[in-house]
Curated annotation (Swiss-Prot):
GO-annotated biological processes: antibiotic biosynthetic process
Molecular functions per Gene Ontology: catalase activity
Induction: By N-acylhomoserine lactone (AHL).
Name recorded for this polypeptide: 2-imino-3-(indol-3-yl)propanoate dimerase
Catalytic activity, EC: 1.21.98.-, 1.11.1.6
The protein's annotated pathway: Pigment biosynthesis; violacein biosynthesis
UniProt keyword annotation of NAD present: no
Gene, per the UniProt record: vioB
Alphabetically ordered keywords of this record: Antibiotic biosynthesis, Multifunctional enzyme, Oxidoreductase
Origin species: Chromobacterium violaceum (strain ATCC 12472 / DSM 30191 / JCM 1249 / CCUG 213 / NBRC 12614 / NCIMB 9131 / NCTC 9757 / MK)
Function: Catalyzes the hydrogen peroxide-dependent dimerization of two L-tryptophan-derived molecules (imine form of indole 3-pyruvate (IPA)), to form an uncharacterized product suggested to be indole-3-pyruvate imine dimer that can spontaneously convert into dichlorochromopyrrolate (CPA). The uncharacterized product is the substrate of VioE.
Known catalytic reactions: 2 H2O2 = O2 + 2 H2O; 2 2-iminio-3-(indol-3-yl)propanoate + H2O2 = indole-3-pyruvate imine dimer + 2 H2O
C-alpha cells in the first residue's frame, strides 16, 4: 500500500519556495472575482505607474523588523508579506537518500543507493527548449495556506556525487500537478513572537505518482550496486503495481533574512510502490484524524501480522532555534517531537493492537515518521491511536480526488454557454476502495460551482460547472477534506474585441496591469509589463506562455493561473496585431532582362550553354559518388548497408529500369546533356559556331548566372539533393531569387521580338539528336530531333528544355516527369528513412589539379595522374563535337562518326575514370578524390574536314602516350584500346577510308 509497503526509499533535504505574498491581501485591495485592484477604496487608476501602488502597500502597517517583531520602521510589511517579489519557483535542494527499507523493515544505511540525489524539475518548455526547468508552487487561493499546488514535470534520481552531466539512475515525467494534503498549523509547539510564527508552524504533505507504463518512466540500463534498487525494479514487475509514489512533507519554514527573499522548508520523503486502486496524490491507508489542535493526520496499514504507520506530519516538534546551527543548514534546528507518551493503537472493542513507544516517534530524523510494529491481534471496526495527552480517531469514510486546485471558467451568460469539467473521485471505507453513491459535500467561498454526480463502479465522476467567479472549496464530509478551486473572472465580453482593437494599451488595461500591480517580480527580474517595447518584442512568447493549453505546465504564465480564456486569447490577438503592423513594401517585379539585339541573344545563349553544362556535371558527380550495384552488394555483406538501402541507392539487381537514386540522377544528367545540345542548336541557328561551354562553380557561377543556389561538384547527400531541387525550382511556384526558367524567359522573349534572327536560307541548322527525350515528347512529337531552323522551332526547343526541367505548370502532364518533381520524390524517399542514409563515397568537393578558390586540390599521385588524363579526354570529346559542327552538317548527329566518337569517349572513358577517381584516395585524410572540375578546353576546329580529323588523331596519340606512362593496372586495357581505336578511326576519316556518317 504505497509508502506503507516495501521496499521504501527514504530521503531528506530542503525545499526552496519562492511564492509571492502580496496577493494574500490582508487589507482587501484585491477583488479575486474580477482580478482588479483598489487603492484607498477606489479602483486603481491604470494610467498611474504600478510603483505607486507598490509604495502604497509598503506604507501600510503593521510593520516588522528583521527579528519579526513589531517595528514601525521595520522593513517587513504585512500588506506585502515577506516575499512580494516571489516568482512561484519551487525546487528541492540537497535532497538525498538517507536510508532504505525492504521486506524486514529494518533501515539499511549502507546500501549503494544511500546518498543518491533526488530532484524535482519543471516541464520542458517546447517553445524555449530549456533545461534546468523549475517547478512551480501556486496558491490557487492566496488567502489560504491549504491551497498550494505543485506544477512539476520531471522526477529524477542520480548517483551520489552526480554532476550535471552524470547519467541519472531513474527519470520519470510527471503529467499531473499535485496539491497540498494534510495542511496543519501548530507543527512547532513553541512560538517565538515572530510575525511569521504561523508560517513557521505549518506542515504540509505532498504526493505524486508516476506510472510505469509511461514512455519516459526509465531506469538507467547500466549496472548499479544496490540491493534496494534491484528489489524496487523487481517489485515493479507485479501487475498490481502501477508505478512509483513519491510522498514528501514540508515544515519548519526558514526565517526570511530580508523582504523579497525565497524561503526554505525542511523536507522528508519516501519513494514507494503505487498500487492499483490508490489515488496518485493522496496518501493511501486507513486515515486517523487528531482530536487536539497542533496534531496532524496519519495513515496506517494493517497486514501480514504487522502495522505500518505514516506519522510524517502527525506529531509537532517542541521547539525551534532562532537560526540554523551550521552554515550548510538552510533552516533553524528543531527540538524533539512533543513527548506524548507511548501511543496505543486499539480497535473499536478497545483491544490493543500495537504500541508506538515514545522513543520511536521521537527518533524522527532516523525514521522520518514511518514506523513498523508487530500486530498483537487482528483489528475489528474503527481504530484509535491515543495516549493520555493525544488521540486520533479513524475516519471511516474518506473521499478524495487527484484533481485539486481546479480553475473553472465563469459562464458566458450573454450566449448561454457553460464550461463544465469532469473530475474522478475515489471513496475508501477504512482504507479499502468502496462505491459511495452519496458523497456529502457543500460549497464554501466567494465562488460558486454546480456539481453533478455519476457513479462509475468504485469511482464517482463529478461534473463541475463554474457559476460565480471567485475562490471556492467543495467541502467533503465533515469538512476535514476539501477540493479547492477557483472560478475565473467573467471576461467573456473581451471576446468581442477585434485584432485591430487589441493594441498594447488595450492588453495592458484589461490583462497585464493586474499582474504588474500584484506580482512585481516580472518588472524586477524579467521585464516590466508596463514597458510597451518589451511586450511588443516578446508578443509571440507571451502568447505561447499564456496559451490555455499550457495551463498545467510549470512554465505557464501567469504562474498563478487565474487568467481566464478570453483574456488569454487577447494575447493571441495582440500578437496578430503586432504582426499586422509589418506591411510589405513590395519591390518592383524583377522580370526577365530584355535582350536588345541578335548579338546579345547569342551571348545569352552561350551563357545558357555554360549553365546547362555546369548543371549536368553536378548531377553526374553526385551520381558517380554513389557506389554501383556490385559495390552496394558488398556494403550489404559488410553490414554497412541494409538490403533496403541498397534498393534505394542502386535499385534492383536485375539492372532493368529500377536503378535507384544513382540511375535516376544519371537519367536527369543525360537529359541535361540534351538541353546543352538544344541550346547549341539555338545558337547555331543564328549563324554562330558550336560553343563547347565552360563549367562554372561557386562564386564564378553566381556572378555569371545570377542564381542564389550554389553550384558545386559534391557527393550525393540530403543537402546536395536540396540544392538540386532548388536549381530546378519552377517559375510558376513563387520563390525568392532568380530561377533557371527566368534565364530562358528572356531568351524566349528575344526570339519572339527580334527580327531577322534567321538567315534567308530555308532548312534546318545545327544537329539532330533523338536520345534521352521523354515519352511524352515521343507521343506528341514522334519526329522531333531537337532541330532548330525558324522562330517556331526555336520556341518549341525552349519549351522542351523548360518543361523537362520544371514541368511547365502544376496541371501539366510534364510536371510529374519533370526534373523538379522527380528530385522532390527522391528527396521524400530519402527523408522517409527511419535513420539518415548517406550512400555516397566521401569524395572531395570541387576537386582540382591546381589550387583554385572554392576548390580542393588533390594531392595523391595516382589520383592526379588519372585526373590529368580525364581532363585530356574531356577536351578531346568537345574537340570532336566542335569539328563535327565546323563543317555545318545537315545530317543527324547520331549518324556522325565524330559525334558517336565523342559519346563513346564520354561513356567508355570519362565515366569509368570518374568512378575510379571516386574510389581513390585524394591525399586528404578521410576523403576520396573525384573527377576534376574541368578547365577551359581547346576546341580548335578546321574548315578542312581531313585536317581536322588528323589533328584529332594526334590528340588521341598524345593521350595514349600519357596513359602509357601510368603504372600498370591504373588504367584498364579496354580504355587504352578505345583511345587507340579512335586514333586509327580519325586517320581513316582523314584519308577517306571511312564515310563521315555511319
Amino acid at each position: 500500500m504505497s509508502i506503507l509497503d516495501f521496499p521504501r526509499i527514504h530521503f531528506r533535504g530542503w525545499a526552496r519556495v519562492n511564492a509571492p505574498t502580496a496577493n494574500r491581501d490582508p487589507h482587501g485591495h484585491i477583488d479575486m472575482a474580477s482580478n482588479t485592484v483598489a487603492m484607498a477604496g477606489e479602483p486603481f487608476d491604470l494610467a498611474r505607474h504600478p510603483t505607486e501602488f507598490h509604495r502604497h502597500l509598503r506604507s501600510l502597517g503593521p510593520r516588522f523588523g528583521l527579528d519579526g517583531r513589531a517595528d514601525p520602521e521595520g522593513p517587513f510589511s504585512l500588506a506585502e508579506g515577506y516575499n512580494a517579489a516571489g516568482n512561484n519557483h519551487f525546487s528541492w535542494e540537497s535532497a538525498t537518500v538517507s536510508h532504505v527499507q525492504w521486506d524486514g523493515g529494518e533501515a539499511d544505511r549502507g546500501d549503494g543507493l544511500v546518498g543518491a540525489r533526488l530532484a524535482l524539475w519543471g516541464h520542458y518548455n517546447d517553445y524555449l527548449r530549456t533545461t534546468f526547468n523549475r517547478a512551480r508552487w501556486v496558491d490557487s487561493d492566496p488567502t489560504r495556506r491549504d491551497a498550494a499546488q505543485i506544477y512539476a514535470g520531471q522526477f529524477t534520481i542520480s548517483p551520489a556525487g552526480a554532476g550535471p552531466g552524470t547519467p541519472w539512475l531513474f527519470t520519470a515525467d510527471i503529467d499531473d500537478s499535485h496539491g497540498a494534503r494534510w495542511t496543519r498549523g501548530g507543527h512547532i509547539a513553541e512560538r517565538g513572537g515572530h510575525f511569521l510564527d504561523e508560517e513557521f508552524g505549518l506542515a504540509r504533505l505532498f504526493q505524486f505518482s508516476v506510472p510505469k507504463d509511461h514512455p519516459h518512466f526509465l531506469f538507467h540500463p547500466g549496472p548499479f550496486d544496490s540491493e534496494a534498487w534491484r528489489r524496487l525494479q523487481l517489485a515493479l514487475e507485479d501487475d498490481d503495481v502501477l508505478g512509483l509514489t513519491v510522498q514528501y512533507a514540508l515544515f519548519n519554514m526558514s526565517t526570511p533574512p530580508q523582504p523579497n527573499s525565497p524561503v526554505f522548508h525542511d523536507m522528508v520523503g519516501v519513494v514507494g510502490l503505487w498500487r492499483r486502486g490508490e489515488l496518485a496524490s493522496y496518501p493511501a491507508g486507513r486515515l486517523l484524524r487528531p482530536r487536539q489542535p497542533g496534531l496532524g493526520d496519519l495513515t496506517l496499514r494493517v497486514s501480514g501480522g504487522r502495522v505500518a504507520l505514516n506519522l510524517a506530519c502527525a506529531i509537532p516538534f517542541s521547539t525551534r532555534a532562532a537560526q540554523p546551527s551550521a552554515p550548510d543548514r538552510l533552516t533553524p534546528d528543531l527540538g524533539a517531537k512533543l513527548p506524548l507518551g507511548d501511543l496505543l493503537l486499539r480497535d473499536e472493542d478497545g483491544a490493543l493492537l500495537a504500541r508506538v513507544p515514545q522513543a520511536l516517534y521521537q527518533d524522527y530524523w532516523t525514521n522520518h515518521g514511518i514506523v513498523d510494529l508487530p500486530l498483537l491481534r487482528e483489528p475489528r471496526g474503527s481504530l484509535t491511536l491515543s495516549s493520555e495527552l493525544a488521540e486520533w480517531r479513524e475516519q471511516d469514510w474518506v473521499t478524495q480526488s487527484d484533481a485539486s486546485n481546479l480553475y473553472l471558467e465563469a459562464p458566458d451568460r450573454r450566449h448561454g454557454r457553460f464550461f463544465p469539467e469532469s473530475i474522478a473521485l475515489r471513496s475508501y471505507f477504512r482504507g479499502e476502495a468502496r462505491a459511495r453513491p452519496d458523497i456529502p459535500h457543500r460549497i464554501e467561498g466567494m465562488g460558486l460551482v454546480g456539481v453533478e454526480s455519476r457513479q462509475d463502479g468504485d469511482a464517482a465522476e463529478w461534473r463541475l460547472t463554474g457559476l460565480r467567479p471567485g475562490p471556492a472549496r467543495i467541502v467533503l464530509d465533515d469538512g476535514a477534506e476539501a477540493i479547492p478551486l477557483r472560478v475565473l473572472p467573467d471576461d467573456w465580453a473581451l471576446d468581442d474585441a477585434t485584432v485591430e482593437e487589441v493594441d498594447y494599451a488595450f492588453l495592458y488595461r484589461h490583462v497585464m496591469a493586474y499582474y504588474e500591480l500584484v506580482y512585481p517580480f516580472m518588472s524586477d527580474k524579467v521585464f516590466s509589463l508596463a514597458d510597451r517595447c518589451k511586450c511588443e518584442t516578446y508578443a509571440r512568447l507571451m502568447w505561447q506562455m499564456c496559451d490555455p493549453q499550457n495551463r498545467n505546465k510549470s512554465y505557464y504564465m501567469p504562474s498563478t493561473r487565474e487568467l481566464s480564456a478570453p483574456k488569454a486569447r487577447l494575447f493571441l490577438k495582440y500578437l496578430a496585431h503586432v504582426e499586422g503592423q509589418a506591411r510589405l513594401q513590395a519591390p518592383p517585379p524583377a522580370g526577365p532582362a530584355r535582350i536588345e539585339s541578335k548579338a546579345q541573344l547569342a551571348a545569352e545563349l552561350r551563357k545558357a550553354v555554360d549553365l546547362e553544362l555546369s548543371v549536368m556535371l553536378q548531377y553526374l558527380y553526385a551520381a558517380y559518388s554513389i557506389p554501383n550495384y556490385a559495390q552496394g552488394q558488398q556494403r550489404v555483406r559488410d553490414g554497412a548497408w541494409t538490403a533496403e538501402q541498397l534498393q534505394l541507392a542502386c535499385g534492383s539487381g536485375d539492372r532493368r529500369r529500377d536503378g535507384g537514386i544513382r540511375a535516376a540522377l544519371l537519367e536527369i544528367a543525360h537529359e541535361e546533356m540534351i538541353h546543352y545540345l538544344v541550346v547549341n542548336n539555338l545558337l547555331m541557328a543564328l549563324g554562330e559556331p558550336f560553343y563547347a561551354g565552360v563549367p562554372l562553380m561557386g562564386e564564378a557561377a553566381r556572378q555569371a548566372f545570377g542564381l542564389d543556389t550554389e553550384f558545386a561538384l559534391e557527393p550525393f547527400s540530403e543537402s546536395t539533393l536540396a540544392r538540386f531541387v532548388r536549381l530546378e525550382w519552377p517559375h510558376f511556384i513563387p520563390a525568392p531569387g532568380k530561377s533557371i526558367a527566368d534565364c530562358y524567359a528572356a531568351i524566349r522573349q528575344a526570339f519572339l521580338d527580334l527580327p531577322d534572327l534567321f538567315g534567308g536560307e530555308a532548312g534546318k541548322r545545327g544537329g539532330e539528336h533523338h536520345l534521352f527525350l521523354n515519352e511524352l515528347t515521343n507521343r506528341a512529337h514522334p519526329g522531333y530531333q531537337l532541330e532548330v531552323f525558324d522562330r517556331d522551332s526555336a520556341l518549341f526547343g525552349i519549351a522542351f528544355v523548360t518543361d523537362q526541367g520544371e514541368g511547365g505548370a502544376l496541371d501539366s502532364p510534364h510536371y510529374e516527369h519533370s526534373h523538379f518533381q522527380r528530385l522532390r520524390e527522391m528527396s521524400a524517399r530519402i527523408m522517409a528513412q527511419s535513420a539518415p542514409f548517406e550512400p555516397a563515397l566521401p569524395a572531395l568537393r570541387n576537386p582540382v589539379l591546381d589550387e583554385s578558390p572554392g576548390c580542393q586540390r588533390v594531392a595523391d599521385g595516382r589520383a592526379r595522374a588519372l585526373m590529368a588524363l580525364y581532363q585530356g579526354v574531356y577536351e578531346l570529346m568537345f574537340a570532336m563535337m566542335a569539328q563535327h559542327f565546323a563543317v555545318k552538317p545537315l545530317g543527324s548527329l547520331r549518324r556522325s562518326r565524330l559525334m558517336n566518337a565523342a559519346i563513346d569517349l564520354m561513356t567508355g572513358l570519362l565515366r569509368p575514370l570518374s568512378c575510379a577517381l571516386m574510389n581513390l584516395p585524394s591525399g586528404i585524410a578521410g576523403r576520396t578524390a573525384g573527377p576534376p572540375l574541368p578547365g577551359p578546353v581547346d576546341t580548335r576546329s578546321y574548315d578542312d574536314y581531313a585536317l581536322g580529323c588528323r589533328m584529332l588523331a594526334r590528340r588521341c596519340e598524345r593521350l595514349l602516350e600519357q596513359a602509357s606512362m601510368l603504372e600498370p593496372g591504373w588504367l584498364p586495357d579496354a580504355q587504352m584500346e578505345l583511345l587507340d581505336f579512335y586514333r586509327r578511326q580519325m586517320l581513316d576519316l582523314a584519308c577517306g577510308k571511312l564515310s563521315r556518317e555511319a
